[in-house]
Swiss-Prot record:
Listed InterPro entries: Ribosomal_uL29, Ribosomal_uL29_CS, Ribosomal_uL29_sf
GO MF annotations in UniProt: structural constituent of ribosome
Example of a GO biological process term: translation
Pfam families reported in the protein's UniProt record: Ribosomal_L29
Record's protein name: Large ribosomal subunit protein uL29
Organism of provenance: Pyrococcus furiosus (strain ATCC 43587 / DSM 3638 / JCM 8422 / Vc1)
SUPFAM superfamilies in the record: Ribosomal protein L29 (L29p)
Subunit organization: Part of the 50S ribosomal subunit.
A Gene Ontology cellular-component term: ribosome
Family of the protein in this entry: Belongs to the universal ribosomal protein uL29 family.
Annotated keywords: Ribonucleoprotein, Ribosomal protein
């Protein structure tokens, strides 16, 4: 997921995407724990990075919102 795509999303959409990716990450980790070999081991790393990217941009948006409230 590209940062430009995330920046176009609203905070609510970002929250929904974070929940979705965390659920998917839990499933992948569960498969790994059970001893199942993953089709693509990079999936877990990519999910973690996407979640971090979403959280970072969400925090940026919240700071911008707070900054706007303070100036008014």
């Amino acid at each position: 997921m590209k940062p430009s795509e995330i920046r176009e999303m609203s905070i609510e959409e970002i929250d929904a995407k974070i929940r979705e990716l965390r659920l998917q990450l839990a499933k992948e980790r569960g498969l790994l724990t059970m001893g199942t070999s993953l089709e693509n081991p990079m999936v877990i790393r990519n999910l973690r990075r996407d979640i971090a990217r979403l959280l970072t941009i969400k925090k940026e948006k919240l700071r911008e919102r707070e900054k706007g409230k303070v100036k008014k």
